[in-house]
Amino acid sequence: MNPSVSSRPPWSTAFYLGPGFPIQWYGIIVAIGIAFGILMFVLKLIYFYKIQDNSFYFFIFIAVLTMVLGARAWYFLIEAVDGRSSGSNFFDFRNGGLAIQGGVLLTTLAGIIYFNVFLNMKTTKTKTTAKLLNNKNQIKTVYVERNISVFVMLDLIAPCVLIGQAIGRWGNFFNAEVYGAALVGSKNDTLSAANTTWGFLRILMPKVWDGMFINGSFRIPLFLIESFFNTIFFVFIYFVMDHIKGIRSGTIGFSYFLATGIVRLILETQRDEAFKYNTSIVFSALLILVGIVGIIYCQTLAIKLRGYFWTYFFLYGWYKVAAFFTTLFMKDRTQACSSKFAFYEKSLPEKERSFFQLKYYNDVLPPKIYRLYDHEMLMFDKLEAVPEA
């Protein structure tokens, strides 16, 4: 959120570009959060996923635009639904506010469309240091062209949003917003109650301690709590989950929705009434549902449905669909049922959608002709990934 100009504290302004044109700390910190999220995205793109393609950098501009516009549109939507319309102009970002839920929603939709269309139009160069065995033994770095699943892109992008949210929440502090109810002690004393629970802020973060005394009462610093837990979840999802054995593509991305949904659902219910929106509470619950369903799907069903063309899957007939699902949970799946054969025959390799292939870059690459980065065409009988020298 972002309060109106008149309700901001005097220390919310960083500097002035001219008479009547203040630059707020809120905007600066949100920009820093976006920049840091982009940095984490680029670092993982280059050093972990080893992608060499400018098309992925183009999406950064799309993501920033959709994040801001989606957050702004969602703010206007929840204000209208909850009957609190401020009447401010949509493009006057210094008045009114932003709601991150809308930014996440619109950017996710933009990513699905962009990467799904992009991945079906072309293959992408990925860097592989490999042992090339075609009557020779040698180690060489090659750039292999292959299709990349949009679920892998979700794993790459979603965790970076968390650290952006964690940093951006400090902008809410400078705007004196995203706080909880007033703390009141047994003797109607807010100071004693604040010292009991949040006294450590007086030493560690004195500015935060002073800033949480709003309208004569100490308020729970929800922005600080959300920033802390977003950082913890970011570290786990971004740095740890990629190295957990058995984690399938898509699970990391949906873990973001689960994590941010849990944090926001708990904190949204604790907000001060002036900043509490029922729409945000419902949306946070939906994020949790999306995260749980997505993780279950990626860890269980997705691997069994890999390589099937879903258009034929849904249109082939309800009885064939039922027959197909019965085979998914049979212990012996060495022989597919007739409906499964039918789906495979309809799914010509050139028509299979990368969206549902769910492949990581460390998958075993099948024997085929690989187009190298220097446009040299070679046939490899076997391509085995080995650690880089």
From Swiss-Prot:
GO cellular component terms given for this protein: plasma membrane
GO molecular function, one term: phosphatidylglycerol-prolipoprotein diacylglyceryl transferase activity
Membrane topology label: Multi-pass membrane protein
Top-tier EC class: transferase
Metabolic or biological pathway, per its Swiss-Prot or TrEMBL entry: Protein modification; lipoprotein biosynthesis (diacylglyceryl transfer)
UniProt: a 1,2-diacyl-sn-glycero-3-phospho-(1'-sn-glycerol) binding residues: 169
Protein name listed in UniProt: Phosphatidylglycerol--prolipoprotein diacylglyceryl transferase
Lineage, broadest ranks: Bacteria, Bacillati, Mycoplasmatota, Mycoplasmoidales, Mycoplasmoidaceae
Gene field: lgt
